[in-house]
A protein has these predicted regions:
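Beta1/beta-strand and adjacent pyrophosphate-binding region of the FAD-binding site
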Residues: 2-18, 36
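Short alpha-helical segment within the catalytic ATP-binding CA
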Residues: 21
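Conserved N-terminal helical subregion
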Residues: 85-154
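N-terminal FAD cofactor-binding segment of flavoenzymes
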Residues: 53-97
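Glycine-rich FAD pyrophosphate-binding loop
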Residues: 13, 25-61
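Acidic-histidine catalytic/liganding microenvironments
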Residues: 30, 76, 135-136
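Glycine-rich Rossmann-fold phosphate-binding loop(s) that bind the pyrophosphate
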Residues: 15-17, 40, 121
Length: 154
């Protein structure tokens, strides 16, 4: 565990897929910022050949990633690692069983390759956390909780 810094430009509380992705995007777009990512649970040691052991947010559940999210991961240089573990969404069926109305969307009819991708959270976690370790402007503090924050005027 890294000691919690006393000051940072940005503090991200929560190291799930959204928090880690935000940290990666900030490191890429605004590398001059000092970012602190705080996660209550300990992150496991990474072995890219193995799925993560249970970690909140990076477990055996699956997540549907929108086309824009897939594009963001490509911009971060991560999609090449993620793609072999992804399944494209070609069709969406929307209904409220027992009630009037439904909608069916087909990627082909919308002239898009897919609406997004479905991926197991565990592999997404492996790739995101490995990328995070390569970001010198992000300090990761795992296994800690935040009880208070103070904002400072510049």
């Amino acid at each position: 565990m890294t000691a919690l810094p006393t000051e940072a430009d940005v503090a991200i509380i929560g190291g799930g897929m959204v928090g880690v992705t935000l940290a990666l995007m900030l490191a890429r777009e605004l590398p001059q910022l000092q970012v602190v990512l705080v996660e209550g649970q300990r992150f496991p040691a990474l072995d890219l050949t193995q799925p993560l052991p249970y970690t909140a947010g990076f477990d055996a559940r699956n997540t549907a990633l929108s086309r824009r999210t897939v594009q963001a991961f490509a911009e971060l240089g991560l999609w090449q690692q993620l793609q072999p573990h992804a399944t494209p969404i070609h069709q969406i069926h929307i209904s409220d069983r027992g009630h009037f109305g439904l909608s069916r969307l087909r990627a082909e009819e919308e002239q898009v390759e897919s609406f997004g991708q479905v991926m197991e959270n565990a592999w997404l976690g492996v790739v995101l956390l490995a990328a995070l370790k390569q970001c010198p402007s992000v300090t990761v503090c795992d296994g800690v909780s935040v009880s208070a924050l103070q904002t400072l005027a510049e």
